[in-house]
A protein has these predicted regions:
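Acidic/glycine-enriched edge-of-secondary-structure segments
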Residues: 44-49, 377
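C-terminal capping region of solenoid repeat domains
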Residues: 80-83, 94-99, 171, 175-185, ...
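Short, conserved beta-strand segments within well-ordered enzyme catalytic domains
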Residues: 47-51, 70-74, 109-113, 136, ...
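A generic tandem-repeat structural signature
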Residues: 89, 96-196
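F-box-proximal linker/hinge
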Residues: 24, 39, 49-108, 120
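N-terminal Skp1-binding subsegment of the F-box domain
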Residues: 1-33
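Short helix-loop-helix/strand-helix junction enriched in hydrophobic and basic residues
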Residues: 11, 26-44, 56, 65-66
Length: 594
């Protein structure tokens, strides 16, 4: 039937139909129908997403999809965001850029996350891709403003330059002046991560000559008194990240900012607010009724002033804020913002055990009751109860992402002193479409039994300081059918769960374990048993087989790959394949010889 159907349509028709299929997993399914569909999909694929840059080689991707226009790559594991991945681990993008520079000369978009990007990479991008339009560097490192200057000077069709949360070496603030005077195509510019000043005159000229600029996110070095000037040059902005605020309130600055913002009739997103002075907040009230996104995660504004601001934002769909909002502010959010989809509450003092704000579980309960469209939560707090989690689960069965971070590890239900198993069990039982879950607090193997039983659509699970034994990890790996990424730290999970579920690991993107009970011997056995997996032991104490095989390793990163062992492993990373024992023996002999 599939064969007859495939033969009944001309290739041009199928190519047109396939162009409407956006999800990678759906396109992958299409390519499996028959050989002709495989070939058509292969030649008409324009976008490629690779969640692990070591899962496949650049050459393989280029052979498989010869006409790609957009590439998205991820490098380091997610736990790198919490400094759990040692410096120098890897994630180098240069081999990809080098391969694509000769084969994808028509490439238009590159999006990178947690990768090492050098100035040489950026210069090669600028030189190789003549119609290059989009560069997104999210949480990347290794490059400087010299590399950005090469992009600015050469990429004449660039529409998007986004450096979100990247670590950039600010060699010079004049790199923006490298955009040619004839350049007018910019739509998105995010330089919020830069630490040093940029040339304001160059920034002003750039903003003035780009009529399609929709998103502008400035760094804190851009003073508030100059923001009004930029807004007057770009009243068409839809998204704005403010610069730094001045310590003293100046009436002329307040008035100028208020007037300039009132002229931005399309503005829907606000962020920045570094060192925001509460007296300046009323200047943004004129745009609040249109706001759908508000990022206050850098604003040390107290609850009283936040309440006044949020009460002006009835259309808000996404809010990022510090815990200064407190329960009272979240109650106002719940009563005002009925269209809220995403809430992230970050800690103002993450390393202080004593509560410095009035934020409890009740704030999140209020939002779950008042915001019927809420589907994504990241919530840092210092206390939680099973009853609150059960209420949240029943209020919001539409939740797809739930990440709860209790500041103190292994904190129980503070009212009953019981583990939080029942509460998280309710989350996975009631939220049928849950895709991402982060656990915290006192948890036993029972919660993992709940997860394995109910979380059938969960794709990513993050676990820390939880569980009793290997049984907990076994419940997850054997029960969660859709699991792609599992990251674990400081848990008693070890060899039995790892080896018993070896075949499950081949269906996942990756497993990260640090400070657990996994032995070097188990890692070596897994590597020998599963050739399609890269089992990487990360141990800064020296070669792992210089210690007994029963000795736990510091970290292990396991991922599915069709590329085999990588070639850029530093001295503290060892790949456990069938030849590992021989290599280790030679390494020890060589080291001893020295």
């Amino acid at each position: 039937m599939h064969k007859r159907l495939a033969l009944s349509f001309p290739e041009e028709v199928l190519e047109h139909v396939f162009s409407f299929i956006q999800l990678d997993k759906d396109r992958n399914s299409v390519s499996l129908v028959c050989k002709s569909w495989y070939e058509i999909e292969r030649w008409c694929r324009r976008k490629v997403f690779i969640g692990n840059c070591y899962a496949v080689s650049p050459a393989t991707v280029i052979r498989r999809f010869p006409k790609v226009r957009s590439v998205e790559l991820k490098g380091k594991p997610h736990f790198a965001d919490f400094n759990l991945v040692p410096d120098g681990w890897g994630g180098y993008v240069y081999p990809w850029i080098e391969a694509m520079s000769s084969s994808y000369t028509w490439l238009e978009e590159i999006r990178l996350k947690r990768m090492v990007v050098t100035d040489e990479c950026l210069e090669l991008i600028a030189k190789s891709f003549k119609n290059f339009k989009v560069l997104v560097l999210s949480s990347c490192e290794g490059f400087s403003t010299d590399g950005l200057a090469a992009i600015a000077a050469t990429c004449r069709n660039l529409k998007e330059l986004d450096l979100r949360e990247s670590d950039v070496d600010d060699v010079s603030g004049h790199w923006l002046s490298h955009f040619p005077d004839t350049y007018t195509s910019l739509v998105t510019l995010n330089i919020s991560c830069l630490a040093s000043e940029v040339s304001f005159s160059a920034l002003e000229r750039l903003v003035s000559r780009c009529p399609n600029l929709k998103s502008l996110k400035l760094n804190r070095a851009v003073p508030l008194e100059k923001l009004a000037t930029l807004l007057q040059r770009a009243p068409q902005l839809e998204e704005l990240g403010t610069g730094g605020y001045v310590a003293e309130v100046r009436p002329d600055v307040f008035s100028g900012l208020s007037v300039a913002l009132s002229g931005c009739n399309k503005l829907k997103g606000l962020s920045g607010f570094w060192d925001a002075v509460p007296a300046y907040l009323p200047a943004v009230y004129s745009v609040c009724t249109r706001l759908t996104t508000l990022n206050l995660s850098y604003a040390t504004v107290q609850s009283y002033d936040l309440v006044k601001l949020l009460s002006q934002c009835p259309k808000l769909q996404r809010l990022w804020v510090l815990d200064y909002i407190e329960d009272a502010g979240l109650e106002v959010l719940a009563s005002t913002c009925k269209d809220l989809r995403e809430l992230r509450v970050f800690p103002s003092e993450p390393f202080v055990m004593e509560a410095n704000v009035g934020l409890t579980e009740q704030g999140l309960v209020s939002v779950s009751e008042g915001c019927p469209k809420l589907e994504s939560v990241l919530y840092f707090c210092r206390q939680m109860t099973n009853a609150a989690l059960v209420t949240i689960a029943r209020n919001r069965p539409n939740m797809t992402r739930f990440r709860l971070c209790i500041i103190e590890p292994k904190a129980p239900d503070y009212l009953t002193l019981e583990p939080l198993d029942v509460g998280f069990g309710a989350i996975v039982e009631h939220c049928k479409d849950l895709q991402r879950l982060s656990l915290s607090g006192l948890l036993t193997d029972k919660v993992f039994e709940y997860i394995g039983t109910y979380a059938k659509k969960m794709e990513m699970l993050s676990v820390a300081f939880a569980g009793d034994s290997d049984l907990g990890m076994h419940h997850v790996l054997s029960g969660c059918d859709s699991l792609r990424k599992l990251e674990i730290r400081d848990c008693p999970f070890g060899d039995k769960a790892l080896l018993a579920n070896a075949s499950k690991l081949e269906t996942m993107r990756s497993l990260w374990m640090s400070s657990c009970s996994v032995s070097f011997g188990a890692c070596k056995l897994l590597g020998e048993k599963m050739p399609k997996l890269n089992v990487e032991v990360i141990d800064e104490r020296g070669p792992p087989d210089s210690r007994p095989e029963s000795c736990p390793v510091e970290r292990v990163f396991i991922y599915r790959t069709v590329a085999g062992p990588r070639f850029d492993m530093p001295g503290f990373v060892w790949n456990m394949d069938q030849h590992s024992s021989m290599r280790f023996s030679r390494q020890i002999i060589t080291t001893n010889g020295l």
